[in-house]
Amino acid sequence: MPQSFTSIARIGDYILKSPVLSKLCVPVANQFINLAGYKKLGLKFDDLIAEENPIMQTALRRLPEDESYARAYRIIRAHQTELTHHLLPRNEWIKAQEDVPYLLPYILEAEAAAKEKDELDNIEVSK
């Protein structure tokens, strides 16, 4: 069974609240992010989430228009950069403080709505 974004967010919160796990996992995660290279293409982490599922489609529809345009621009620019086999100039790389989860709140909201709808669709009435 694939994990939901809600469960992944809970695991992340648990790791960040635990001092031992935080000291162990955060440096590894930061190194992984640096090696992944998506920031060098001008992408944020939320730009990498696959769009081909109903939850993500709902979250993208709920995204504010200006953020949606910024997302599309970042993705198109990254594709163009990849086609030319270059990286963006260092001053255009996404910095760690700029890489905030702009889409995750909408994904969690859409997941909660889908879960509630599923529970209501499968409700059993007992006497």
UniProtKB/Swiss-Prot annotation:
**Which locations, inside or outside the cell, does it occupy?**
Mitochondrion inner membrane
Disulfide bonds, paired cysteine numbers: none
Primary location class: mitochondrion
Keyword Plastid attached: no
Mention one GO biological process in which this protein takes part, according to its record: cellular respiration
The protein's UniProt keywords, in alphabetical order, are: Electron transport, Membrane, Mitochondrion, Mitochondrion inner membrane, Respiratory chain, Transport
Q: One short Pfam family name for this protein?
A: UCR_14kD
* A GO CC term attached to the entry: mitochondrion
Membrane association type: Peripheral membrane protein
Give the family from UniProt.
Belongs to the UQCRB/QCR7 family.
Quaternary structure (record):
Component of the ubiquinol-cytochrome c oxidoreductase (cytochrome b-c1 complex, complex III, CIII), a multisubunit enzyme composed of 10 subunits. The complex is composed of 3 respiratory subunits cytochrome b (COB), cytochrome c1 (CYT1) and Rieske protein (RIP1), 2 core protein subunits COR1 and QCR2, and 5 low-molecular weight protein subunits QCR6, QCR7, QCR8, QCR9 and QCR10.
**Task of the protein:** Component of the ubiquinol-cytochrome c oxidoreductase, a multisubunit transmembrane complex that is part of the mitochondrial electron transport chain which drives oxidative phosphorylation.
PANTHER family to which the protein is assigned, alphabetical: CYTOCHROME B-C1 COMPLEX SUBUNIT 7, UBIQUINOL-CYTOCHROME C REDUCTASE COMPLEX 14 KD PROTEIN
What further note is attached to this protein's record?
A: Present with 10100 molecules/cell in log phase SD medium.
Q: What is this protein called?
A: Cytochrome b-c1 complex subunit 7, mitochondrial
Write the gene name: QCR7
